[in-house]
Amino acid sequence: MLDIRLIREQPDMVKAALGRAGVDPAQVDAVLAYDEQRRALLREVEKLKALRNAVSKEIGKMSDAGERDTKIAEMRAVGDRIAALDRELAAVEERQYAALMELRNLPHPAVPDGPDETYNVVIAQEGEPRAFDFAPKPHWELGEALDIIDFERGVKLSGSRFYVLKGLGARLQRALIQWMLDLHIQQGYHEVYTPFVVKEQCMWGARQLPKFRDNLYRDVEDDLWLVPTAEVPVTNLHRDEILEADQLPLRYCAYTPCFRREKMSAGRDVRGIKRGHQFDKVEMYMFVHPDTSYDELEKLRADAEATCRLLGLTFRTKELCTGDLGFAATRTYDIEVWAPGQGEWLEVSSCSNVEAFQARAANIRYRSAPGARPEYVHTLNGSGLGLPRTLIAIMENYQQADGSIIIPDVLRPYMGGAEVIRRS
């Protein structure tokens, strides 16, 4: 969430920055209006409390019983007024908090302007799309022909946008997860294995709520939410904590399945496994000192790019424009791999700096020195990488004319030395 002091002290700057991302300035005005109401109520409450305290001291010195009783009755009325104002204050604070939570993060000044993804800027590309001497097939045809993806039984089990991985297909997915975790540990991340369901407070802390409520799965009976990304539980590992400066940076990697209703993507990517209600992802996450967060963003990007490189995939990196930037992000790099069977680039990693946006909501702070006033950390997140799109890219790039799929070298030790996937 944004700093209310920043909004109060620099409203024009905040409106201009949010305007670059298409935010109506009226949303900022609403937050400021609630803030003024809250401050006015606080002033009135403090004034009445000061009056009550002063008169209470006088009452103790009064010798006239009638005068004392009169003052006591007056102070009871003052107390009732304070209680009523406190209730009004709580209601205004709740409305202000709700309005504040609707505001997205401020785009970094260096982020390119643009209304949508067509204005994203390609800043790097490594490799060229493979030249085939046959027509490459899309992964859904390869998967069915090799009997490693079963769409029909996925639908039978759970409905549309579900599938079953079988045999070496399932093993390839597991190999990718294990290899990516091992790689990120080598890159300096600490592995954690978290719950896949979390309390609602975790969703607010990671800023998934209220923005993405309709895209999330929830267990209503126990009031638990299925994670849409490992970013949610990992953010909340240090919720309501004060870290010491010498603990930073904290870098974590985590595997979770991810659950999304995909209501925002209805009708898109209905073939294959590109977009499902359940998918696997390895996440990289950082808690860092504010002074180093943009250096850490470059590390995050480099680590995600290295993952693509080691898999032998052609990839490119884009900087997202203001209109495509995620709700919580100040700056984001998307890394895309080429999928020749579909003839398109697939996003497998999105690396973002969110500065203090999540930390303020989750109350995650650090102390720069003993006795110093705690300040909010900066947090960053990046996919390292997302499945099944990485699986798609491997299947389509490593396919052979006979329909088999060569297994990338780095994954073979995780697959018992298997070198190729053929129909058994």
Curated annotation (Swiss-Prot):
Entry keyword set: Aminoacyl-tRNA synthetase, ATP-binding, Cytoplasm, Ligase, Nucleotide-binding, Protein biosynthesis
GO biological process per UniProt: selenocysteine biosynthetic process; seryl-tRNA aminoacylation
Stored NCBIfam families: serS
Record's catalysed reaction(s): tRNA(Ser) + L-serine + ATP = L-seryl-tRNA(Ser) + AMP + diphosphate + H(+); tRNA(Sec) + L-serine + ATP = L-seryl-tRNA(Sec) + AMP + diphosphate + H(+)
Gene label: serS
This protein's name: Serine--tRNA ligase
Enzyme class: ligase
Subunit-level organization: Homodimer. The tRNA molecule binds across the dimer.
A GO MF label: ATP binding
InterPro entries attached to this UniProt entry: aa-tRNA-synt_IIb, aa-tRNA-synth_II, aa-tRNA-synth_II/BPL/LPL, Ser-tRNA-ligase_type_1, Ser-tRNA-synth_1_N, SerRS_1_N_sf, SerRS_core, tRNA-bd_arm
Role summary: Catalyzes the attachment of serine to tRNA(Ser). Is also able to aminoacylate tRNA(Sec) with serine, to form the misacylated tRNA L-seryl-tRNA(Sec), which will be further converted into selenocysteinyl-tRNA(Sec).
Pathway: Aminoacyl-tRNA biosynthesis; selenocysteinyl-tRNA(Sec) biosynthesis; L-seryl-tRNA(Sec) from L-serine and tRNA(Sec): step 1/1
Gene Ontology cellular component list: cytoplasm
Gene3D superfamilies: Bira Bifunctional Protein, Domain 2, Serine-tRNA synthetase, tRNA binding domain
Main location: cytoplasm
Binding site for ATP: 260-262, 347-350
Residues passing through the membrane, by range: none
Residues involved in L-serine binding: 229-231, 283, 383
Family label: Belongs to the class-II aminoacyl-tRNA synthetase family. Type-1 seryl-tRNA synthetase subfamily.
Localisation: Cytoplasm
Cross-referenced Pfam families: Seryl_tRNA_N, tRNA-synt_2b
Notes concerning its domains: Consists of two distinct domains, a catalytic core and a N-terminal extension that is involved in tRNA binding.
